[in-house]
Amino acid sequence: MSDQKAITSEQEMKAYRVQGFTCANCAGKFEKNVKQLSGVEDAKVNFGASKIAVYGNATIEELEKAGAFENLKVTPEKSARQASQEVKEDTKEDKVPFYKKHSTLLYASLLIAFGYLSSYVNGEENIVTTLLFLASMFIGGLSLFKVGLQNLLRFEFDMKTLMTVAVIGGAIIGEWAEVAIVVILFAISEALERFSMDRARQSIRSLMDIAPKEALVKRNGQEIMIHVDDIAVGDIMIVKPGQKIAMDGVVVSGYSAVNQAAITGESVPVEKTVDNEVFAGTLNEEGLLEVEITKLVEDTTISKIIHLVEEAQGERAPSQAFVDKFAKYYTPIIMIIAALVAIVPPLFFDGSWETWIYQGLAVLVVGCPCALVISTPISIVSAIGNAAKKGVLVKGGVYLEEMGALKAIAFDKTGTLTKGVPAVTDYNVLNKQINEKELLSIITALEYRSQHPLASAIMKKAEEENITYSDVQVEDFSSITGKGIKGIVNGTTYYIGSPKLFKELLTNDFDKDLEQNVTTLQNQGKTAMIIGTEKEILAVIAVADEVRESSKEILQKLHQLGIKKTIMLTGDNKGTANAIGGQVGVSDIEAELMPQDKLDFIKQLRSEYGNVAMVGDGVNDAPALAASTVGIAMGGAGTDTALETADVALMGDDLRKLPFTVKLSRKTLNIIKANITFAIAIKFIALLLVIPGWLTLWIAILSDMGATLLVALNGLRLMRVKE
């Protein structure tokens, strides 16, 4: 551990919300300023979520002073009650018309219009015309000049430094009209950039409003409405039909269907009854439920999702790291190129000083890296927000990019490709004189007394067939270790067990057709159980871990999306593994694996394919998940472990969201690459116009503003990617 990390870990971390970020560069500068405060050991800005984590001691006044260059407002992280109020205030702020938020921009634009009118009436050199352009420039660019001049004095070069030098230079050579236009268009570009990021952030902030802020709670024999901040673990919450559930808990009374789309993305309501878990933010559609609270409001699943999503926005993707590194050298290089353009032609080629200084100033403007800087954050924030709303938690931009580059995906079998719950797949009565339902009631009555893990499958089958077994009298019930069970019903001794048990019981030879039938069932990955007496075999029941209905379709979609290899990893025997693997359509099957074998196999896949994902439950597969490029856990809504350990968590307990996540990730990767390429290309093309002397301040600022706007809109498209 480094000294810096050691210091950071010892300090108390305080989180703050920040209002007023216009760009990622401003966020980086704010972070640098905060780190320089005397009581601060470290600080980390999360531009995507508009937050800063401060390690050490700093007052609000000190933090706001560090952000004075951008007039940043800093507030401490809120409690649930305060956060709900903050969301309301943010919503009100969002509803304020664009022109009211940027009134100075409007006034500056009006002054420019009057300036051009005066230029037409009185001439360009008229003092009134000059004063109108000058006033427009100062009103529209005051904040720009303050920051730009401070940067110049400190020899810090960013986009505002470039613009300030360009504006001052333009004013010196008398290009008042063009300079005023540059200032206004730059201000508009910044406003649009901020608006775009706010739109992307709003998709996350809206998650905070999913769960109600108050709940009806039983206390001292009364039902009272209480704010969620004041609800304690163990309280009984009453949820009426049509109401949203305010807190996580367990049903203690009632039956209903609950729509969990807000958490898991599943559109089909899930039945809930006693002992079933419910989540804050989900909708109770039918019956009245009484729920015992199991988590405080800050620990609910939705709260953890919001927290993890905001943390994810702060994780820098590889493309963001590239942009940051590139921008560090890019701005000084642009300053040097602009200086060379302004000086070299007049000094060595008899060029006009005025013409080439103008060209140099245009290079400064066109070199402004606005579009480049926003290209990645706008895409990452939009994609993560979209995924969260559809029940997929992505822990950071790095995992979005790695998901987009996946070549192979490994799946655990049990509970992932299969339901993880045994079910009766075959029930064949061999003696046609016996009533099937009566025999099933006897079988169920015997299995009810058994501790065998497959007994639950038979009991579930009886419930589905509406067969009662509670009135069946079983005498002398006993377990035959390793072979089966037996019991007496109506004077007849019945046995349920393996083929081996009946080969020992029956005096006559084991029927060849029956043996073939059992072998076929076993080859299909099923466990065959025989029911009979000491004299004859009555029926065969096959039980298996059922394949999820969606597994085959999902694997087909993944192959269509370009995933080259899908592998099933399981500890089951080869027969069962091959049967299930064949049903779902995986490319490869690896059976009889120990946890260490799964880990080794993932490492082998990574060496062969590079980017490999592992899909499991987030608990038993933890080593393999950790070893993969991207660990994907299912059923994140029901387990804190999955939320914490996985890189990507599918909140619903099925794989339907996996193809969407791969699709979204690939689109994100493509859009980020397109944005970066376009942002750099447009600058390069504009710079080429310097050679024939065609580059003007108009063209420079319009290319910069246009590139920023197009990059932002392209990134926002990720909010609309559908399943």
Swiss-Prot record:
Keywords per UniProt: ATP-binding, Cadmium, Cadmium resistance, Cell membrane, Ion transport, Magnesium, Membrane, Metal-binding, Nucleotide-binding, Phosphoprotein, Plasmid, Translocase, Transmembrane, Transmembrane helix, Transport
Protein location: Cell membrane
Cited function: Couples the hydrolysis of ATP with the export of cadmium.
EC annotation from Swiss-Prot or TrEMBL: 7.2.2.21
Chemical reaction(s) catalysed: Cd(2+)(in) + ATP + H2O = Cd(2+)(out) + ADP + phosphate + H(+)
Lineage start: Bacteria, Bacillati, Bacillota, Bacilli, Bacillales
Gene3D superfamilies xref list: 3.30.70.100, Calcium-transporting ATPase, cytoplasmic domain N, Calcium-transporting ATPase, cytoplasmic transduction domain A, HAD superfamily/HAD-like
Binding residues annotated for Cd(2+), in chain numbering: C23, C26
A Pfam family recorded for this sequence: HMA
Organism encoding this protein: Alkalihalophilus pseudofirmus (strain ATCC BAA-2126 / JCM 17055 / OF4)
UniProt name for this protein: Probable cadmium-transporting ATPase
The organism's place on the tree of life at top rank: Bacteria
Residue ranges annotated for the HMA domain, each copy included: 12-75
